[in-house]
UniProtKB/Swiss-Prot annotation:
Pfam families: Flavodoxin_2. Belongs to the azoreductase type 1 family. Homodimer. It comes from Rhizobium etli (strain ATCC 51251 / DSM 11541 / JCM 21823 / NBRC 15573 / CFN 42). The lineage of its organism: Bacteria, Pseudomonadati, Pseudomonadota, Alphaproteobacteria, Hyphomicrobiales. It catalyses: 2 a quinone + NADH + H(+) = 2 a 1,4-benzosemiquinone + NAD(+); N,N-dimethyl-1,4-phenylenediamine + anthranilate + 2 NAD(+) = 2-(4-dimethylaminophenyl)diazenylbenzoate + 2 NADH + 2 H(+). FMN binds at S10. This is FMN-dependent NADH:quinone oxidoreductase 2. InterPro entries: Flavodoxin_fold (IPR003680), Flavoprotein-like_sf (IPR029039), FMN-dep_NADH:Q_OxRdtase_AzoR1 (IPR050104), NADH:quinone_OxRdtase_FMN_depd (IPR023048). It comes from the Bacteria.
Amino acid sequence: MTNILIVTSSPRGPEGLSTRFATEIAEGLKTALGGTLSRRDLAANPPPHIAQAYIGGRVVGPETRTPEQAKAVGLAQELVDEVTAADVIVLGSGMINFGPSSQLKAWFDHITWPGVTFGYSAAGKPQGLLTGKKVYLVTASGGVFSEGDWAAFDFQTGYLRHLLSFIGLTDIQIIRVEGTVFGPEAAKAAIAATEAQVRAVLEKAA
């Protein structure tokens, strides 16, 4: 049985293109592969930014945590458990000021946990611990950042790929929807191009 986790983060909710196409992929994969589909909407239920309760709570035993620490670490453990249980992860990220949303950054801050999702070798080299999973990363941007003059300002795609790889999620396929702000025809073409990418993903999975 295949366990699929979809994580969306667009403040626009279902109207966001990253959410739309991530949902199409996740639901299409469930149809093709069977199994379960779990959903985490970071815009509707944003995780808090990490604070002292989380930082201090994760380095002490459960029996010595304060109520605030237990709550903070409990949320992080819940988010880690969702990722750990998944065989396939579909991650939707709409670009905000050249990078991912703060909600998505907070999610990564909770699941990037030393000794749990990453560790270090004897030589001091970081090693991701969440291995053997497939990730579909759906990114959305109004401009075109995959090439051309603005490619240097894409602080979303490479950053997310690095964070995923750091915790062991190295099998990543990127699906972009971009160039939607240059008029109706450009938006139509951009969406059609992404729809073709989504079809290719689902045809390969079938």
